[in-house]
From Swiss-Prot:
CDD domains: 7tmA_OXGR1. Its main location: membrane. GO terms for cellular component: membrane; plasma membrane. Changing residue 261 to A: Loss of itaconate-induced receptor endocytosis and intracellular calcium response. Changing residue 114 to A: Markedly impairs itaconate- or alpha-ketoglutarate-induced intracellular calcium response. Keywords: Cell membrane, Disease variant, Disulfide bond, G-protein coupled receptor, Glycoprotein, Immunity, Innate immunity, Membrane, Receptor, Transducer, Transmembrane, Transmembrane helix. The gene is OXGR1. This is 2-oxoglutarate receptor 1. G protein-coupled receptor for dicarboxylates and amino dicarboxylates. Receptor for itaconate, a metabolite produced by myeloid lineages. In the respiratory epithelium, couples the binding of itaconate to the activation of GNA11 and downstream intracellular Ca(2+) release, leading to mucocilliary clearance of airborne pathogens. Receptor for leukotriene E4 (LTE4) produced by mast cells upon allergic inflammation. Binds with high affinity to LTE4 and elicits mucin release from pulmonary epithelium in response to airborne fungi allergens. Regulates mucin-producing goblet cell homeostasis. Gene3D superfamilies: Rhodopsin 7-helix transmembrane proteins (1.20.1070.10).
Length: 337
């Protein structure tokens, strides 16, 4: 009995199923060309100056620094670094997936994109743990208020993110396809078996575990504040806003991306029709900018976390605008004596 050979022979009679063994044509190039550059462009144009203002505000205006201030500053830095990778990806997808920046930059941009994505997730998790300790166990966790604890926690987050994402530099590379140099996404690379297990471990440790921690932290916080007889109404309102922002970030921005990335990789390993595989790929493409949309939510988070942040931002912007006006007046005066 030659059942495997007969199966392959029969499969070859149906182009869709024959293609499912790795020869499916990517029919989603128009979606990548028109959807990804536009969404990434909007995110960059809003997020980059927004996070630059946030960082300037935290460094020059926010005093004294608290543990939450240090975590938020690190979060803003990682969001800014994350956003710097978007112009390269915008150019890549807008040009029909033609990578012109070389193999090193391909690895670096893909690494930077994922490194800062997971740093952002872990900083949000770290912030949630600190909030939980301050509200639920204020006396036993008194030392967590010290900035030294926040500095150590942030250093640990950077190290974990680096260790988690550095294998990606070996799995991602630029390759020549149809006279074009392509910088492949993790799910489109060739080392499928290695990528499958790496992706599962990466997703479990740097997303699923933080998701559970953040959910438990904020459900406990809300339950405690709701049933607390002497809890200040302002504190309750602030906790609710933080809960909504954090859970929206994890369940709306990060969750669809990670679920569809797992499904996308599995679809390349399974014997399914090309039409189904392309539909899965299309859904995965749509989910990718959702992860970047988290940078919008973080801009709101900075305002909710600190009562003085909004005033400090206004002060920073006013100083910048007045400085530019003063410089313009000097230039105008020097040109017209």
């Amino acid at each position: 009995m030659n059942e495997p050979l007969d199966y392959l022979a029969n499969a070859s009679d149906f182009p869709d199923y024959a293609a499912a063994f790795g020869n499916c044509t990517d029919e989603n190039i128009p979606l990548k060309m028109h959807y990804l550059p536009v969404i990434y462009g909007i995110i960059f144009l809003v997020g980059f100056p927004g996070n630059a203002v946030v960082i300037s505000t935290y460094i020059f205006k926010m005093r004294p620094w608290k543990s939450s201030t240090i975590i938020m500053l690190n979060l803003a830095c990682t969001d800014l670094l994350y956003l710097t990778s978007l112009p390269f990806l915008i150019h890549y997808y807008a040009s029909g997936e033609n990578w012109i920046f070389g193999d090193f930059m391909c690895k670096f941009i893909r690494f930077s994109f994922h490194f800062n994505l997971y740093s952002s997730i872990l900083f949000l998790t770290c912030f949630s743990i600190f909030r939980y300790c301050v509200i639920i166990h204020p006396m036993s966790c008194f030392s967590i208020h010290k900035t030294r604890c926040a500095v150590v926690a942030c250093a640990v987050v950077w190290i974990i993110s680096l260790v988690a994402v550095i294998p990606m530099t070996f799995l991602i590379t630029s390759t020549n396809r149809t006279n074009r140099s392509a910088c492949l996404d993790l799910t489109s690379s060739d080392e499928l078996n290695t990528i499958k297990w790496y992706n599962l471990i990466l997703t479990a440790t740097t997303f699923c575990l933080p998701l559970v921690i953040v959910t438990l932290c904020y459900t406990t916080i809300i339950h405690t504040l709701t049933h607390g007889l002497q809890t200040d109404s302002c504190l309750k309102q602030k906790a609710r806003r933080l809960t909504i922002l954090l859970l929206l970030a994890f369940y709306v921005c990060f969750l669809p991306f990670h679920i569809l990335r797992v499904i996308r990789i599995e679809s390349r390993l399974l014997s399914i029709s090309c039409s189904i595989e392309n539909q899965i790929h299309e859904a995965y493409i749509v989910s990718r900018p959702l992860a970047a949309l988290n940078t919008f939510g973080n801009l709101l988070l900075y305002v909710v976390v600190s009562d003085n942040f909004q005033q400090a931002v206004c002060s920073t912007v006013r100083c910048k605008v007045s400085g530019n006006l003063e410089q313009a007046k000097k230039i105008s005066y020097s040109n017209n004596p």
